[in-house]
């Protein structure tokens, strides 16, 4: 399993930050679902709490909160994320489930509780 990427959104400032997740920490995130809160220790942010809002796999398929599975699934959709159909046209698309698996390369997070130190003060931070 390669290193994954965490995209952390700060609702106060409107900025996003990238953090690389080592494979040993990523293995402890496997099995978590979209909407769950995780501790900021996974991303070297002590005291922070974050909510998982989405992600994408190695293949580039987006995670969907309405699919309660870990793998890929083909679903029939009208107008939704992943497809913008017109006038009732439906299409079968491939999407990821809402459970984090070993093939997820990007996790999107939103800060829900702030820690003692601001994210901007971290030296190894890259702003997205």
UniProtKB/Swiss-Prot annotation:
Any one GO biological process: translation
Cellular compartments per GO CC: ribonucleoprotein complex; ribosome
Gene Ontology MF term list: structural constituent of ribosome
Domain of life: Archaea
Alphabetic keyword roster: Ribonucleoprotein, Ribosomal protein
InterPro entries from the UniProt entry: Ribosomal_eS6 (IPR001377), Ribosomal_eS6_arc (IPR020924)
Pfam families hit by this protein: Ribosomal_S6e
Xref: PANTHER family: 40S RIBOSOMAL PROTEIN S6 (PTHR11502)
Listed HAMAP family: Ribosomal_eS6 (MF_00512)
Similarity-based family: Belongs to the eukaryotic ribosomal protein eS6 family.
The protein, known as: Small ribosomal subunit protein eS6
Organism (species): Thermoplasma volcanium (strain ATCC 51530 / DSM 4299 / JCM 9571 / NBRC 15438 / GSS1)
């Amino acid at each position: 399993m390669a290193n994954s990427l965490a995209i952390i959104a700060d609702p106060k400032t409107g900025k996003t930050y990238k953090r690389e997740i080592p494979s040993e920490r990523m293995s402890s995130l496997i099995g978590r679902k979209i909407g769950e809160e995780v501790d900021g220790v996974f991303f070297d942010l002590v005291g922070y709490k974050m909510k998982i809002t989405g992600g994408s796999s190695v293949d580039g398929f987006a995670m969907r909160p309405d699919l309660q599975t870990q793998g890929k699934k083909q679903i029939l959709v009208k107008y939704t994320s992943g497809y913008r159909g017109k006038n009732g046209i439906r299409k079968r698309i491939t999407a990821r489930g809402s459970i984090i698996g070993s093939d997820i390369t990007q996790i999107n997070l939103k800060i829900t509780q702030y820690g003692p130190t601001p994210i901007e003060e971290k030296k190894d931070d890259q702003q997205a």
